[in-house]
Amino acid sequence: MSIIINGKKTANDLCEELSKKIDILKKEYNVFPCLKVILVGSNPASQVYVRNKQRKAESIGISSETIVLPDSISEDELIEKVNTLNEDSSVHGILVQLPLPKHISASRIINTVSVEKDVDGFHDENVGRLVKGEKNCLIPCTPKGSLHLIKSVENNLSGKNAVIIGRSNIVGKPMFHLLLQENCTVTILHSQSRDLADYCSKADIVVAAVGKPNFVQPDWIKKGAIVIDVGINSINIGNQSKLVGDVDFEGVKEKVKAITPVPGGVGPMTIAFLMINTLVAACLQKGVDPSDFIA
């Protein structure tokens, strides 16, 4: 019988444990983790994401504030705001919510955030540390959360064939390096790839992050595979909208060893690992070994 991986419960369990660690950090080390989120403009989806992040942070003892800026702000003004937070020693994590307005370079803003406070893990230096397999670096939250879900089903991934569909800097590429570090044989598929079904049919692990509803078909997936669906797409059925992933969940779920649902799979894990990254960042900035708090 297939396992429907409950990302919401796993994330809640992680955050419950994290809350206890934060209490210890405050009482024994006098470290009070603080996360600042910058939201530029009034994108409704971004507002929801930011609100969820702030609520979760506050619920586990992380001080959190959302700084809302107009979408007319210039790139230089935004950089100045980020630098103010960089210089504030009471702030341990800085997150600039993406996407940004078209007149602002996301790459430039991401790389303005201090490496030590880059809780998204998007800074070029943190990307390099991930590629090199360094310990205690800040790793993008969605891939890290996805790996945790995979290992909750199959702890030893050595020698497994893994396929990632999607090559974004946020999910696909960091996921590649995380699975490589687990000694998987990893293939990335993308919009120019041929024979996607053939590659997927040989995979023990499939991570779908392509942003196309129900893109991955049942006959692509081999029996007993682990499928992680990172996609979140809104489709209209009749007069109602429904959230679905990149995988044909109903068609795939009966043949796999395990699969994440949408919603309730990877999404909550992204927020949980943002909280973990904030704790790691606070520890590193205050000279505390994060491994004392994070397994």
Swiss-Prot record:
For this protein, the record's Pfam families field holds: THF_DHG_CYH (PF00763), THF_DHG_CYH_C (PF02882)
E.C. number: 1.5.1.5, 3.5.4.9
How it assembles, according to the record, is: Homodimer.
What is an annotated GO biological process for this record, any one?
A: tetrahydrofolate interconversion
Q: What is this protein called?
A: Bifunctional protein FolD
Entry's Gene Ontology molecular function annotations: methenyltetrahydrofolate cyclohydrolase activity; methylenetetrahydrofolate dehydrogenase (NADP+) activity
Task: Check the record and name the InterPro entries matching this protein.
Answer: Aminoacid_DH-like_N_sf (IPR046346), NAD(P)-bd_dom_sf (IPR036291), THF_DH/CycHdrlase (IPR000672), THF_DH/CycHdrlase_cat_dom (IPR020630), THF_DH/CycHdrlase_CS (IPR020867), THF_DH/CycHdrlase_NAD-bd_dom (IPR020631)
What this protein catalyses is: (6R)-5,10-methylene-5,6,7,8-tetrahydrofolate + NADP(+) = (6R)-5,10-methenyltetrahydrofolate + NADPH; (6R)-5,10-methenyltetrahydrofolate + H2O = (6R)-10-formyltetrahydrofolate + H(+)
Output the PROSITE patterns linked to this UniProt entry. THF_DHG_CYH_1, THF_DHG_CYH_2
Gene3D superfamilies annotated for this entry? Leucine Dehydrogenase, chain A, domain 1 (3.40.50.10860), NAD(P)-binding Rossmann-like Domain (3.40.50.720)
Record's GO cellular component, any one?
A: cytosol
Q: Does the keyword Transmembrane apply?
A: no
Give the residues the record marks as binding NADP(+): G166, R167, S168, S191, I232
Per UniProt, which keywords does this protein have? Amino-acid biosynthesis, Histidine biosynthesis, Hydrolase, Methionine biosynthesis, Multifunctional enzyme, NADP, One-carbon metabolism, Oxidoreductase, Purine biosynthesis
Q: Which HAMAP family match?
A: THF_DHG_CYH (MF_01576)
State the species of origin. Wolbachia pipientis subsp. Culex pipiens (strain wPip)
Pathway assigned to this chain's UniProt record? One-carbon metabolism; tetrahydrofolate interconversion
| UniProt keyword NADP present | yes
| Protein's job | Catalyzes the oxidation of 5,10-methylenetetrahydrofolate to 5,10-methenyltetrahydrofolate and then the hydrolysis of 5,10-methenyltetrahydrofolate to 10-formyltetrahydrofolate.
